[in-house]
Amino acid sequence: MADLDDIKDGKDFGIGTPQTNTPYTLKGCGALDWGMQSRLARIFNPKSNRTVMLAFDHGYFQGPTTGLERIDLSIAPLFAETDVLMCTRGILRSTVPPATNKPVVLRASGGNSILGELSNECVAVAMEDALRLNVCAVAAQVYIGSEFEHQSINNIIKLVDAGNRYGIPTLAVTGVGKEMARDARYFSLASRIAAEMGAQVVKTYFVEEGFEKVTASCPVPIVIAGGKKLPEHEALEMCFRAIDQGASGVDMGRNIFQSSAPLAMLKAVKKVVHENMSAREAFQFWQEEKQGEGQ
């Protein structure tokens, strides 16, 4: 215990200087509990209120797809440069070194595969296990308009309720099935429903027309999915336009780890997201980094 012989009375109480409260300015998150805000502040850069997430959770329904055959060889070299890791608990425990010390968004839905109905998912992780893994958020798909729409919405509700008990945010991912639309009207509907159910963050797709309506009508931060592999200049253009139209970040997988220069691509995406670099400048940056890395 402290030495009781040398206790000095306090003198500097700042009389006349009111105590100020620092507001948490991430969209729609100002009234969340301290622990949840703290976790979100690790995901979203407090200076830009934006994030670059590296998604490599595809194996939970796709198996060892191109670029993810060996996480330890292809993805681990990218850990240091990304803001956030998005993966499953199996990969986290088996392949991600704890000393990586990056915030994790944990894939918490599953039970489906590319061989069956994609929307037929369940909650695949108990919140207590997410706590053991020290993650900053959990993620699940929501399939609006699908055969298992109600089930997927209920998955989000379960995660939100459990997350609220422990201070862990839920990221709802607007899944798109084989026959489902990919337009602003659909993604506005899906994103708004996810937010109304209590998701603190929504991941959705960028669309060429009306994306600003998707972000404006969603009361919480939206991060865009990278989607299918695009040429690097197109992927960077998509990033720039999404940020310019209100997105709070990107959650990219294939457009990074399937790039001919993944590390350079990740750095270029961060330039766009956090520094508002234009797509043209970012593509030039990628080319220079690619040459510098000998890729």
UniProtKB/Swiss-Prot annotation:
Pfam families: DeoC (PF01791). It catalyses: dihydroxyacetone phosphate + acetyl-CoA = 3-hydroxy-2,4-dioxopentyl phosphate + CoA. It is an enzyme of class 2 (transferase). One of its GO terms (molecular function) is fructose-bisphosphate aldolase activity. GO terms for cellular component: cytoplasm. Its EC number is 2.3.1.245. CDD domains: DhnA. Keywords: Cytoplasm, Schiff base, Transferase. The active site is at K203. Its main location: cytoplasm. It comes from the Bacteria. Gene3D superfamilies: Aldolase class I. It is found in: Cytoplasm. Homodecamer. PANTHER family: 3-HYDROXY-5-PHOSPHONOOXYPENTANE-2,4-DIONE THIOLASE, FRUCTOSE-BISPHOSPHATE ALDOLASE CLASS 1. Belongs to the DeoC/FbaB aldolase family. Involved in the degradation of phospho-AI-2, thereby terminating induction of the lsr operon and closing the AI-2 signaling cycle. Catalyzes the transfer of an acetyl moiety from 3-hydroxy-5-phosphonooxypentane-2,4-dione to CoA to form glycerone phosphate and acetyl-CoA. This is 3-hydroxy-5-phosphonooxypentane-2,4-dione thiolase. The gene is lsrF.
